């Protein structure tokens, strides 16, 4: 797992997310506490449970982006789910237990990739030798032993050099590789994904592990042989054991749109997609044991981070038991014009940098002036205020409208530099921001 300190985590998040310091601090402390807990003795470690987080804020302010970036920093099993996809146990739809099954599958994949990387050098050596065995002919029988060895060594070195330089990539060779059985696609109702996976595994294993001779280009043969040899060096049972332990000790679940499963005060009758889902989530968040195809997984020490806009409801509309299991509540602020301006320029791979790079592929060079950036930010903020506040996502809509003519006529402007200044922005966005009805239609 990641050993980054809270300031380091916040610093990394700052590269992609503008503002929202409280939320960044909360998730960075929670992530660091995962590492701190692992340094304790086993008896005390069991008693220390994670403090789950509820992030509250309007749409488009960075809740989901924080989770997405946190997943890359965590180096721990991580899964993001939408609360609206689940229904109460006994009804058609995904059950909440599938969250832990999916998290375990993600952990298996993560541990498997780590093991493959660990064995990368060894696998490359084995694959190289197998390719050379096919490429290098056997010396003639009437040669002396020393002549054979000398000739063989020279030939092998020659081919090894060419192979490493990629000179032989297009050359075709005949090799024996494991034959893959025909894939079987099984359609199943929601909530029966586990059974579907088991049936697919059964059909895939029916063909056994037979080898077949295939004629392939060397570059394609290397890919197939690498997969085959990497699989041989992996102990599947050890991976399962390690993955389950990683999930139980360091797993992180991000539940988005949790406000959509709040039961409104004026509703009546059974509510299978709201309060029932909350009650099903309780055992997971509090700690229970879930059965997966890889083994039993305990959820006692999994960190849950929930988020929601709560525009038509409030956190108090969640059932009290669930509120109590999300003790850390962080409010994210609505974005200002200054925030929009920073979002356009400061993050790594900012929106403006993306548009510049896209246009440069056609030889068109875009230059955004400081005044132009400010005008774009003001336009996005104005549309948000007058129509519907969708946060930073509005910038994509505004910039797409602004760049429409340039994108359409890019091939005619090859070699030109186009400056997007205050006048250009006003000319192309003035009608959009001044006419509310037109704005509603376009956006």
UniProtKB/Swiss-Prot annotation:
GO molecular function ontology, one term from the record: peptidase activity
Residues reported in the UniProt entry to bind ATP: 18, 60-65, 256, 321, 393
CDD domains: RecA-like_HslU
HAMAP family (UniProt xref): HslU
Any one Gene Ontology BP term: protein unfolding
Cellular compartments annotated: Cytoplasm
Entry's transmembrane regions: none
A Gene Ontology cellular-component term: HslUV protease complex
Role of this protein: ATPase subunit of a proteasome-like degradation complex; this subunit has chaperone activity. The binding of ATP and its subsequent hydrolysis by HslU are essential for unfolding of protein substrates subsequently hydrolyzed by HslV. HslU recognizes the N-terminal part of its protein substrates and unfolds these before they are guided to HslV for hydrolysis.
Primary localisation category: cytoplasm
NCBIfam families noted in UniProt: hslU, PRK05201.1
Subunit structure: A double ring-shaped homohexamer of HslV is capped on each side by a ring-shaped HslU homohexamer. The assembly of the HslU/HslV complex is dependent on binding of ATP.
Protein family per UniProt: Belongs to the ClpX chaperone family. HslU subfamily.
Pfam families membership: AAA, AAA_2
InterPro entries: AAA+_ATPase, ATP-dep_Clp_protease_ClpX, ATPase_AAA_core, Clp_ATPase_C, HslU, P-loop_NTPase
Keyword Nucleotide-binding in annotation: yes
Entry-linked PANTHER family: ATP-DEPENDENT CLP PROTEASE ATP-BINDING SUBUNIT CLPX-LIKE, MITOCHONDRIAL-RELATED, ATP-DEPENDENT PROTEASE ATPASE SUBUNIT HSLU
Name recorded for this polypeptide: ATP-dependent protease ATPase subunit HslU
UniProt keyword list: ATP-binding, Chaperone, Cytoplasm, Nucleotide-binding
Superkingdom, taxonomy of origin: Bacteria
């Amino acid at each position: 797992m990641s050993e980054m300190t809270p300031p380091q985590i916040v610093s990394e998040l700052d590269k992609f997310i503008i503002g929202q310091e409280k939320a960044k601090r909360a998730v960075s402390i929670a992530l660091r506490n995962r590492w701190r807990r692992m340094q304790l003795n086993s008896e005390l470690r069991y008693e220390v449970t994670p403090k789950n987080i509820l992030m509250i804020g309007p749409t488009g302010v960075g809740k989901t982006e924080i989770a997405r970036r946190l997943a890359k920093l965590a180096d721990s099993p991580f899964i993001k789910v939408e609360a609206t996809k689940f229904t109460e146990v006994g009804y058609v739809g995904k059950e909440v237990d599938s969250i832990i099954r999916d998290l375990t599958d993600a952990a298996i994949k993560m541990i498997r990739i780590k093991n493959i990387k660990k064995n990368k050098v060894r696998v490359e050596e084995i694959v190289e030798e197998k390719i050379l065995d096919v490429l290098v002919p056997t010396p003639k029988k009437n040669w002396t032993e020393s002549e054979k060895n000398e000739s063989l060594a020279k030939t092998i070195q020659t081919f090894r050099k060419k192979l490493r330089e990629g000179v032989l990539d297009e050359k075709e060779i005949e090799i024996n590789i494991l034959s893959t059985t025909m894939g079987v696609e099984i359609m199943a109702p929601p909530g029966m994904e586990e059974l579907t996976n088991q049936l697919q595994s059964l059909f895939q294993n029916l063909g056994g592990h037979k080898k077949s001779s295939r004629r392939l280009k060397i570059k394609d043969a290397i890919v197939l042989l690498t997969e085959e040899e990497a699989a041989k060096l992996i102990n599947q049972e050890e991976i399962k054991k390690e993955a389950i332990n990683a999930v139980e000790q360091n797993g992180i679940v991000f539940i988005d749109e949790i406000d959509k499963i709040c039961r409104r005060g004026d509703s009546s009758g059974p509510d299978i997609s709201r309060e029932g889902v909350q009650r099903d989530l309780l055992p997971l968040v509090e700690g229970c044991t879930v059965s997966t195809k890889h083994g039993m997984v305990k959820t006692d020490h999994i960190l849950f981070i929930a988020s929601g806009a709560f525009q038509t409801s409030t956190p108090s509309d969640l059932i009290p038991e669930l509120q109590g299991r999300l003790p850390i509540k962080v409010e994210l602020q609505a974005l200002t014009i200054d925030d929009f301006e920073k979002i356009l320029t400061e993050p790594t791979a900012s929106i403006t940098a993306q548009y510049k790079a896209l246009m440069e592929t056609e030889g068109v060079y875009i230059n955004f002036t400081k005044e132009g950036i400010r005008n774009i930010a003001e336009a996005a903020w104005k549309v948000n205020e007058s129509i519907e506040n969708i946060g930073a996502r509005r910038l994509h809509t505004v910039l797409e409208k602004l760049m429409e003519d340039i994108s359409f006529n890019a091939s005619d402007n090859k070699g030109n530099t186009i400056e997007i200044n205050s006048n250009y922005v006003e000319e192309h966005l003035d009608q959009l921001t001044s006419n509310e009805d037109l704005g509603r239609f376009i956006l």
